[in-house]
């Protein structure tokens, strides 16, 4: 394996069509699933934890670009480069879908990392890769999939 060329992809929080809206992972899809079933959305803590969300098709394009690039032996962060708190995410969902829903705040969990967002400048530079699907459009696409 000596001399093997590689690239490592470090995705942020991917979401999108075909993600399980009935599970417990993937806050955006889980929130939309609960909204579609008219269930309360549960937030652990005060909703201030922040994450970097990336639509799945943008992630796939980044992976493909990393597989074919001449810039090898790199670690590429793949995300939007923007962090949204859970409260901000809920506001975005409400604004985009024009739907009201109930949120239930639960006691915080010690395992939740306060902030996760990635610097994707190396992927932008070496892979000529950029996010194409803004969060608002990604919410709509995911919602359309769940409603089918």
Give a label for each model feature:
Residues 1-2, 37, 97:
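Helix C-cap/helix->beta junction micro-motif
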Residues 135-148:
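Amphipathic terminal alpha-helices
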């Amino acid at each position: 394996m000596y001399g093997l060329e590689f690239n490592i992809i470090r995705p942020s929080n991917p979401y999108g069509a075909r993600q399980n809206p009935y599970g417990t992972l993937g806050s955006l899809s889980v929130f939309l699933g609960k909204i579609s079933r008219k269930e309360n959305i549960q937030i652990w803590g005060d909703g201030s934890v922040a994450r970097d969300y990336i639509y799945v098709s943008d992630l796939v394009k980044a992976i493909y670009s990393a597989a074919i690039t001449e810039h090898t032996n790199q670690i590429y962060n793949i995300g939007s480069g923007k962090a949204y708190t859970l409260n901000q995410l809920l506001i975005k969902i409400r604004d985009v879908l024009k739907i009201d829903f109930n949120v239930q705040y639960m006691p915080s969990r010690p395992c939740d990392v306060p902030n996760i967002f990635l610097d994707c400048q190396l992927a932008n530079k070496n892979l000529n890769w950029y996010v194409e699907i803004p969060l608002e459009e990604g919410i709509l696409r995911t919602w359309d999939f769940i409603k089918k």
